[in-house]
Amino acid sequence: MNQDNEPVSLSDFKGKKVLAYFYPKAMTPGCTVQACGLRDSKAELDEKNVVVLGISIDPVKRLPKFIERDNLNFTLLSDEDHAVAEQFGVWGLKKFMGREYDGLHRISFLIDENGTIEHVFNKFKTKDHHQVVLDYLNQ
C-alpha cells in the first residue's frame, strides 16, 4: 500500500524504469538522507524515465508524515509484513551494535521497462545513493 493506502503494483509502471529502494525506517537519519538525495535528483531521474518507489516496513500511517516532513516527491510503500522484502531477498539477519535481529537490508533494484531487474545497488553510503544510481544511468 502506498502513502494514500492504495495498492501499487510494478505493472502500474510498465514502460518506465522503476527504482525500488528498500530502506529500514522512515524519518531516521540515514533513511532521511537517502530519501532527500533521491528527492533532489527527481528531475534527472525523470529525464531517464525512472520512477522512484521507497519501500519500508513502516505502517502506512507513518508514510505521509515522512513525505510531508521532508517534502518527498515520490511514492512510499508500506511492506509491514515484509512479504515484498522477502520476495526481493532483502529481509533477513542484521547485526547492529552487537545485536542480531531480522530486518530490512538497504538495497535498491533498478527494474527495466519490461519488469526485469536490470541492476542491484547494494554497496553505497546513504548520502551517495542517488549519485550511484545516476552514475549507473548515465554510463
Please name every model-derived segment.
Residues 1-139:
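Chalcogenol-based redox active-site neighborhoods
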